[in-house]
Swiss-Prot record:
Function (record text): Transcriptional regulator that functions in sexual development; disruption of asd-4 gene results in agenesis of ascus and ascospore with macroscopically normal fruiting body formation. The GATA-type zinc finger domain binds to DNA sequences from its own promoter region.
Biased segments, Low complexity type: 104-113, 306-318, 354-419
GO biological process: negative regulation of transcription by RNA polymerase II; positive regulation of transcription by RNA polymerase II
Lineage: Eukaryota, Fungi, Dikarya, Ascomycota, Pezizomycotina
An annotated Gene Ontology molecular function: zinc ion binding
UniProt protein name: GATA type zinc finger protein asd-4
Description of how the protein assembles with itself and partners: Homotetramer.
Source taxon at top rank: Eukaryota
InterPro entries: Asd-4/GZF3_helical (IPR056998), Transcription_factor_GATA (IPR039355), Znf_GATA (IPR000679), Znf_NHR/GATA (IPR013088)
Keywords from the UniProt entry: Coiled coil, DNA-binding, Metal-binding, Nucleus, Transcription, Transcription regulation, Zinc, Zinc-finger
Zinc finger boundaries on the chain: GATA-type: 16-40
Ranges of compositional bias, category Polar residues: 128-138
Pfam families: Asd-4, GATA
Compositionally biased spans, kind Pro residues: 335-353
């Protein structure tokens, strides 16, 4: 039976579509899915064009490669490859509806795997350097195969081995793989490890719980202290604003007080200035008045000097009393003598008319009375003398200011003898 299967395998062996060879260590496919030998596939992959027929050879050269892989790594890699093959077989079985092919204990699957491990009597090792590329092999499970024929072949071979098939309702044996029961010691060890893990998790949970409680406490304290701090800050700001307001109020009052003081001082200065102006005006007016009095005094001595001479001739006894007064007047009056000479040189007279009026007013009463009795001739002499000193009156006024009090003081006695003269005559 096995020989017939191998014969069927040989008849279905593929050939290269480019060079028509059937002896190659590895089969490849092009972009269109056509089967190529290893040489044609590599040439097409490297050069991008089909391999020419002139390069075809029937001798396959093999290079000797020494495997330096460690035994333990080789075993692990082999186990991984077997597991991968089993997964691929399971996937193909699911696609084709083959349930019995998924079981690794199925002898038909094992026989199929064993038949796939040889090509033309040469074992195919997946660890060989030829299979390093990702190009699929003809017998690689990645290449789609007509599973209907294979399933028929396997169905024919299974009864010959006498292996009973697994019933669909049979449960898997607990002795297979991971379903084996654990011993008491293993259970105790697993329980102890779980308890240790639980205790560790509890400790970690307590730590997290304590940290969380601490954070909550700090947050509560911070939230409780924030209003107090804010209130304290607001109070401090209010106090500072109140102090600033009081200070500004004091400064305002002080400025008002200074303003009032300055106003009072200004009023006082204005009053003083007004008084000074009034005093100056009064002094100026007094100077004019004194000058007029001086002019009157200057005009009167001539009349007085003339008047006592007549009573002396008539009545010598009463005329001796007013003699000292004219002497005092005569001492002050000699100054106007040089004035007429300097007057034309310095400046013209300002206004002689008011002086003449004032000088003429006191003259008629005292001078006219004695002249009627004795001599009318001297009266025109007094009138003629009056206009002479008037031009120099304004200029001589400053020189005569110290003598003004004497004239004012001497004015009463001057009038007295003039009045007594008519009494004596009467």
């Amino acid at each position: 039976m096995a020989t017939m299967a191998n014969h069927d395998r040989e008849t279905t062996q593929p050939t290269c579509q480019n060079c028509a060879t059937s002896t190659t260590p590895l089969w490849r496919r092009d972009e269109m899915g056509q089967v190529l030998c290893n040489a044609c596939g590599l040439f097409l992959k490297l050069h991008g064009r089909p391999r020419p027929i002139s390069l075809k050879t029937d001798v396959i050269k093999s290079r000797n490669r020494v495997k330096t892989m460690r035994p333990d790594l080789a075993k692990q890699k082999k186990q991984q490859q077997q597991q991968q093959q089993q997964q691929n077989l399971a996937a193909t079985a699911d696609m084709n509806g083959g349930v019995g092919m998924m079981d690794p204990n199925n002898p038909a699957a094992a026989a199929r795997r064993a038949s796939q491990k040889s090509i033309n009597g040469h074992p195919v090792d997946d660890n060989s350097p030829v299979s390093r590329t990702g190009t699929p092999n003809v017998y690689n499970p990645h290449i789609p195969i007509d599973h209907s024929l294979e399933y028929q072949f396997q169905a024919q071979q299974i009864p010959g081995f006498g292996v009973p098939t697994a019933s669909p309702g049979r449960a898997p044996s607990p002795m297979n793989g991971e379903h084996m029961p654990q011993t008491h010691e293993q259970l105790l060890a697993a329980n102890a490890s779980l308890k240790t893990r639980v205790s560790e998790l509890e400790v970690i949970q307590e730590l997290y719980r304590g940290r969380l409680h601490q954070l909550e406490t700090e947050e509560n304290i911070r939230q409780a202290s924030e209003p107090g701090k804010l209130e304290a800050q607001l109070r401090a700001q209010i106090d500072a604003m109140g102090e600033a307001h009081q200070q500004l109020q004091k400064e305002l009052e002080e400025s008002h007080r200074r303003e009032n003081m300055l106003k009072r001082r200004l009023d006082e200065l204005e009053v003083e200035l007004k008084d000074v102006k009034d005093a100056l005006e009064s002094q100026d007016n007094g100077r004019h008045k004194k000058i007029r009095l001086d002019e009157n005094v200057k005009t009167e001595p001539y009349a007085e000097v003339v008047e006592p001479q007549q009573p002396e001739q008539q009545q010598p006894a009463p005329a001796e009393q007013p003699i000292p007064t004219p002497m005092a007047i005569d001492e002050a009056t000699p100054a106007p003598a040089p004035a007429p000479e300097a007057a034309p040189e310095q400046a013209p007279a300002p206004a002689p008319e008011p002086v003449q009026e004032q000088a003429q007013e006191p003259e008629p009463a005292p001078v006219s009375e004695p002249t009627e009795a004795s001599a009318p001739a001297p009266a025109p002499e007094a009138d003629s003398v009056v206009p002479e000193p008037t031009p120099a009156a304004p200029e001589s006024a400053p020189t005569e200011e110290p003598a003004a009090p004497e004239t004012e003081a001497s004015e009463p006695p001057t009038t007295a003898p003039v009045e007594e003269a008519p009494k004596a005559e009467s």
